[in-house]
Curated annotation (Swiss-Prot):
The active site is at D332. Keywords: Amino-acid biosynthesis, Aromatic amino acid biosynthesis, Cytoplasm, Transferase. The gene is aroA. Catalyzes the transfer of the enolpyruvyl moiety of phosphoenolpyruvate (PEP) to the 5-hydroxyl of shikimate-3-phosphate (S3P) to produce enolpyruvyl shikimate-3-phosphate and inorganic phosphate. Pathway: Metabolic intermediate biosynthesis; chorismate biosynthesis; chorismate from D-erythrose 4-phosphate and phosphoenolpyruvate: step 6/7. Its main location: cytoplasm. Gene3D superfamilies: Enolpyruvate transferase domain (3.65.10.10). 3-phosphoshikimate binds at K28, S29, R33, S179, Q181, D332, K359. It comes from Nitrobacter hamburgensis (strain DSM 10229 / NCIMB 13809 / X14). It is an enzyme of class 2 (transferase). InterPro entries: Enolpyruvate_Tfrase_dom, Enolpyruvate_Tfrase_sf, EPSP_synthase, EPSP_synthase_CS, RNA3'P_cycl/enolpyr_Trfase_a/b. SUPFAM superfamilies: EPT/RTPC-like (SSF55205). This is 3-phosphoshikimate 1-carboxyvinyltransferase.
Length: 449
């Protein structure tokens, strides 16, 4: 069900082609971090291109509740700009009411880290989907740093109350899985701790927090272990300074029109300002291995983040094997990759997808169900997803989204090229990350009704 309690069903029908030039919304990961670090900095942070989806807006509300001044302005030159006047490291105030993050696990977990280093008490809550997701992996290192947790249900589930440490301790912490959220929570708490806080990863996760901490003036060093892992060390108690941030277009959001264009005959689309951070572009690498025509141009850097213009043309795809080591760089894109695999010729095997089971829904089971109901042969073997591509998808199925925005968008992308229409039971949760998805796809030529 949706936030309002009313489902918003939609049907995607086969279209002639997708043609046009668009900019997908600002990156959700960068948007969350820009708001949080702006709130922890001294002075004003100006953010252009912020994703104005429900998840990010809930983080903005949380920053206001914790004492920062957050305003949305219209600038004659830059358009919409968000201004954040921060309270400084450790400067958060105890909020008057629980912090409600809606459906956003990223916002909730990152703010837990920021609160853990402040001598305040805050209650964290969310919607039914977020309440079902485990938080214990975030809470364990924060408790080692001196934070205290009360009121949690099984597995550290929301709602819960977090009392930040009055004298936070620097720690050396080895993450149990490749998780940018765990790493970021520890680093944000480490801002308030004296000395060096260190996070060790056996598999490198997305590095947006490290890049943005540098942009705001923190002393942080990231060193490769010579294989796939990294060691990140942060010097605590810096004075962060407000900064200008331009949020690049979200590659996770770009994934849906990209795959839709690849599988829809005659398509030729251009996506501008897409983030091309190598720790976020596993999907692009995989699609190219499958034979996708994805061309980069007009590359540039902003706040340490690379971005480029992408031209995507319809392509004949082939099945491939996707190694488990690639998962951290495309963890949010496996659902739509499964759609591409269904239209490919041959078998695609996606390995090591255990983390998909603790997302907004059990995305591993959801991906299989989405394909099966539309006539695609698919199998789950342990944590692997195996898709038998036949070059076409019969379609005709009704996809249950389980309040998951990415299931809804993946199914609608599939319907752009399936033989029969694909129906989606509820699209309202798309607003959490991509409010303009349906009208933007219609502008490109999608037939949604």
């Amino acid at each position: 069900m949706t936030h309002s309690g009313q489902p918003a069903p939609l049907e995607a029908r086969k279209c002639q082609s997708l043609i046009g030039r668009v900019r997908v919304p600002g990156d959700k990961s960068i948007s969350h971090r820009a708001l949080i670090l702006g709130a922890l900095a001294v002075g004003e942070t100006r953010i252009a291109g912020l994703l104005e989806g429900e998840d990010v807006l809930n983080t903005a509300k949380a920053m206001q509740a914790l004492g920062a001044k957050v305003e949305r302005r219209i600038d004659d030159k830059s358009g919409i700009v968000w201004s954040v006047r921060g309270v400084g490291t450790s400067g958060f105030a105890t909020p008057e009411a629980p912090l409600d993050f809606g459906n956003s696990g990223t916002g909730c977990r990152l703010v837990m880290g920021a609160v853990a280093g402040c001598p305040i008490v805050a209650t964290f809550d969310g919607d039914g989907s977020l309440r079902s997701r485990p938080m214990r992996r975030i809470l364990d290192p924060l408790e080692l740093m001196g934070a205290r947790v009360t009121g949690e249900s099984d597995g550290g589930r929301l709602p819960l109350t977090l009392a930040g440490a009055r004298d936070p301790l620097p720690i050396v912490y080895r993450t149990p899985v490749a998780s940018a959220q765990i790493k970021s929570a520890v680093l944000l708490a480490g801002l308030s701790a004296p000395g060096i806080t260190t996070v060790i990863e056996s598999e490198a996760s997305r590095d947006h927090t490290e890049l943005m901490l540098k942009h705001f003036g923190a002393q942080i060093v990231s060193v490769s272990d010579g294989t796939h892992g990294r060691k990140i060390s942060l010097t605590g108690q810096p004075e962060l300074h407000g900064a200008a941030v331009t949020v690049p277009a979200d590659p996770s959001s770009a994934a849906f029109p990209i795959v839709a264009a690849l599988i829809t005959e005659g398509s030729d689309i251009v996506l501008t300002d897409v983030m091309t951070n190598p720790l976020r572009t596993g999907l692009f690498a995989t699609l190219r291995e499958m034979g996708a025509s994805i061309e980069e141009s007009e590359t540039r850097l902003d706040a340490g983040e690379p971005m480029a213009q992408l031209r995507v043309r319809a392509s004949k795809l082939r099945g491939v094997e996707v190694p488990a080591a690639r998962a951290p760089s495309m963890i949010d894109e496996y659902l739509v990759l499964a759609v591409a695999a269904a239209f490919a010729e041959g078998t695609t095997v996606m390995r090591g997808l255990h983390e998909l089971r603790v997302k907004e829904s059990d995305r591993l089971e959801a991906a299989a169900a989405m394909l099966r109901v539309n006539g695609v042969a698919v199998e789950i073997a342990g944590d692997d997803l195996i898709v038998e591509g036949r070059g076409r998808v019969p379609g005709g199925g009704l996809v249950t989204t389980h309040m998951d925005h990415r299931i809804a968008m993946s199914a609608l992308a599939m319907g752009c090229a399936s033989d029969a229409p694909v129906k989606v039971d509820d699209t309202a949760f798309i607003a959490t990350s991509f409010p303009d998805f349906v009208p933007m796809m219609r502008r490109l030529g999608a037939d949604f009704a």
